Every structure is written in C-alpha cells, then in structure tokens.
Amino acid sequence: MCETGPAVNPVPIGGTPQCRMTPYEEETPLPYAPEQDHDRAFLEQAIAQSRRSLDPGTKKPFGAVVVVGGEVVGVGSNRVVEACDPTAHAEVVALRDAGRRLGTFLLEGGTLYSSCEPCPMCLTACYWAGISRLVYAADRHDAARNGHPDLQFYRELALPNRERRLLDEVNVEGEVRSAAVEVLAAWAAAQPGPVEPKL
C-alpha cells in the first residue's frame, strides 16, 4: 500500500520554508561521520542503507548518503515499492533528505555515496542538485548481473532518439511547440538578469 499523508513544511536554517516533502522521504537519524578514510566509511554507510532493503517483495537493495563539509546530511534507501513512487531510488531519497535538512535544493560541493552506480535518472538528479562528486561501490554491470536494468537504460540513452526502443518519443512541432516555448521565454524574461543559454 502506498504511504500517504499531508506534506511537511521544512524550515531551513535562517527562516522561511522552501520545500514541501512527504513523510516517506524522511529518513532515520543521521549516522556518525568518521574522520578517517572518508570514502570507504561513507560507502559502508550507504551499503548499510542498502541492507535495509533486502526484502525482495517490498524493497530494492540500494542505499545512499549525501555528505557536505565532511558531514552526512542525507541518507536514503530504495523506497520505490513501499511508496508507489518510481522515482524514490536511494540516491533521490538521500538528495531529498539532504535538501529537507539543509533547506535548499542546491547541494553544491557535496558528495553522494551510493552502494551501486546510480541509474541515469539518479545521475541526472546529482547534476540538478549541484553534487560535485559521486562515489559508488558496485557498478552498472554488477547491477545487471543481479537483475537490475540500469545498464540497459544507459545503452538506450546512448542511442539517437529515433533508434530508442523502450518508449516512443514524440516531439510535436507547430503551434503546440510555439506555445510551450513562449512559456519558457516568459520565464527567462522574468529573471533578474540575463539567462545564459545552456547549449
């Protein structure tokens, strides 16, 4: 059964709530961050999170932690099945947890530690969050050998759009596209300074 409940208004340091989170995204108390051999120690914490998800009927075995300034600020285990949320991968849950704790969606200078190489969605989430460093243990081939499709997704995304087979991608031209572009342009025009094209 999917978990439901009212959204939570987290209050960031210094003031006003910025993000709305749902209860299932709140993780357990943060573990102690050791001072020596950070990468290995933080990876072990990520793997410990993955062990929380060993029930094959309700979980998928992945875990992650986010570290900023040498401290763990976000933890996550895979919650896709229990939350009925296809985006609730361990890395995304950890990023959400970090954002809630810090009161910001930008985690610049942070490191994400994952028990396994992130899927394309989670890798992109790291980009959006401004994560500076990604450290993982098992890789996409290890995941594939144990029944997880990450490698297939990476191969699919490497193909030109017209050659992809996992879903149909349709870019509609004409008036509909123009209407959508107008919204993008209106947002850019409303920004306080010039918007730099990301081409």
Question: Which residues make up each language-model segment?
Answer:
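Zinc-dependent deaminase
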Residues: 2, 9-55, 127-199
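Short, flexible loop/turn motifs enriched in small residues
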Residues: 57-61
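Short beta-strand scaffold segments in enzyme catalytic cores
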Residues: 62-67
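Short beta->alpha transition motifs characteristic of CBS
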Residues: 74-80
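A short, polar/charged loop-to-alpha-helix boundary motif
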Residues: 80-93, 97
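Immediate flanking context of iron-sulfur cluster ligation sites
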Residues: 104-117
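Local cysteine-cluster metal-coordination motifs and their immediate loop/turn environment
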Residues: 115-132
